Amino acid sequence: MFFFQMPRVPELLFSAWNFRAGARSLLRTSRAGTFTPEDLSRYRAAWAQPGAVTAMINWYRALFRYPGSFRVGRIEVPTRILWGRKDAFLHSSLAGVSHRQCTRAELIWFDQATHWLHLEEPEAVNSALIGFFSTPATP
């Protein structure tokens, strides 16, 4: 994340060689077969839009520039957290942090899933979400 604090350099490296770094990152951090060549072409087309890469990187820049801005109170509404244990970007301990931030939360682990849980386990994710949204909340 410190790398993203530099001006322009992250954008140049991410965009170089037809967004090779971005495509490799998707492939390295997901289960085999998650991203097809067609998927990668679509990502490259999206990344090529003016300002897209800077917008993505600015999220990480803001974490360091405005650290106090991201404080959130307790989450009081029913919450279901879905988490891939093999997430290369978000350490599994953050799932517990998120869970403790909620007064009524359920944490569901996906042992073989990565950061791309919704792409790797779409049926299970959809089932978990439909079940959650179909259940009336209790006060």
What are these regions (language model features)?
Residues S127, T138-P139:
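Short, intrinsically disordered terminal tails adjacent to the first/last structured region
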Residues M1-W109, I130-P136:
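Flexible "cap/lid" subdomain of the alpha/beta-hydrolase fold that forms the substrate-access gate
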Residues A113-N126:
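Catalytic histidine-centered segment of alpha/beta-hydrolase-like enzymes
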